[in-house]
């Protein structure tokens, strides 16, 4: 079994430059990684750089804290998929969950997933939870 095809590389710094993203794409391809996770601003560039390789582009939505409204997350996800992302990892509204607004939390997740499915029914959609934030009172 080759573990590298199960690994995902990330480059999520807000000050990442084009050359760093290009090198991350090249590295993900040369190491046969499963995916490369990037902010939405790099979706189109990375999709072109990764074209023809098995490396999937994973774009983070609502990152880093999940405080975007569902409509903003939905738009981010749709645009990322339209620009070539194969996966979406999104951060839900944990503040809503922690303060007892479970319906708001559920709607946030459901809306983002629905928007992804409208563009690409086969896209992998993942939820990123900061568990340490859940345990803080």
Question: Which residues are covered by each model-predicted region?
Answer:
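Conserved beta-strand positions in the central sheet of alpha/beta enzyme cores
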Residues: 34-37, 87-89, 126
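A general structural detector for well-ordered alpha-helical segments in enzyme core domains, enriched
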Residues: 20-24, 76-80, 105-115
